[in-house]
Amino acid sequence: MFRLFHNQQKAKTKLKVLLIFQLSVIFSLTAAICLQFSDDTSAAFHDIETFDVSLQTCKDFQHTDKNCHYDKRWDQSDLHISDQTDTKGTVCSPFALFAVLENTGEKLKKSKWKWELHKLENARKPLKDGNVIEKGFVSNQIGDSLYKIETKKKMKPGIYAFKVYKPAGYPANGSTFEWSEPMRLAKCDEKPTVPKKETKSDVKKENETTQKDIPEKTMKEETSQEAVTKEKETQSDQKESGEEDEKSNEADQ
């Protein structure tokens, strides 16, 4: 019985030693693995290469390609209506209309800015297309950055507006044209001037003036007749005197 108990105690001691050995091996392996991963991570973290990269940013990246280039069809001119015919108040037709456009972009070279003059049904905004009365392209430069469009003929009564179309390649964001302000021309009828009625006093003054003028006219005529008669008599006397002188000269000879 004592021997059996002693053997059991021995077996338990061996199991404890084996368990401790296994745990120490597992702990050592775990520590070694963690240390290896820690060294690799630290080396990888500190082993960093630096690169200097310059990035080019476009001012207008929404309307340019990857190289910051605009559409080649557009010369980067940028025209907007800055002035027009002032029709505030009453402007009588017929009347010629104009608009001035200012270029806030690059120089206008090849882009075609088209314009139309519309006769509108009303001036409510947004303006709607009406009958196209005249059209053309912006070309008349009147200043460093100013261009003028105008009608060739005078317009009849109605509501008018210029419509300027943006050229091909222009970054329009959906808006491909610009309207001027509506211009209203009125129909003005000229009233004939009514002659002033003469009063009795005006008639009396006119008659008195006429009567005064008659004697003066008669006196002038009589004076002129007397002068003519005297001139004729003088000429006659001179003629007779001349004839007598000739006769006396002949007698002396």
From Swiss-Prot:
**Compositional bias segments (type: Basic and acidic residues):** 190-241
Q: Where in the cell is it found?
A: Secreted, Cell wall; Secreted
Q: Which GO terms describe its cellular component?
A: bacterial biofilm matrix; extracellular region
User: Does the keyword section mention Signal?
Assistant: yes
What broad taxonomic lineage does this protein's source fall under?
Bacteria, Bacillati, Bacillota, Bacilli, Bacillales
- Chief localization class? secreted
Keyword terms of this UniProt record: Cell wall, Secreted, Signal
Residue segments, region Disordered: 190-253
Q: What is this protein called?
A: TasA anchoring/assembly protein
Superkingdom of source? Bacteria
- The record lists the membrane-crossing segments as none
Induction entry: Part of the tapA-sipW-tasA operon. Expression is directly repressed by the DNA-binding protein master regulator of biofilm formation SinR and activated by the extracellular matrix regulatory protein RemA. Also positively regulated by the sporulation transcription factors sigma H and Spo0A and repressed by the transition phase regulatory protein AbrB, probably indirectly. Induced by a high concentration of salt. During most conditions of growth, may be present at very low levels or is not synthesized at all, due, at least in part, to post-transcriptional repression.
Species this protein is from: Bacillus subtilis (strain 168)
The record's note on what follows loss of this gene reads:
Mutation impairs colony surface architecture. Mutant produces fewer and altered amyloid fibers.
Record flagged with keyword Signal: yes
Tell me the leader sequence span: 1-32
GN (gene name): tapA
Q: Where is this region: Important for TasA fiber formation?
A: 50-57
General function of this protein: Required for biofilm formation. Required for the proper anchoring and polymerization of TasA amyloid fibers at the cell surface. Is also a minor component of TasA fibers.
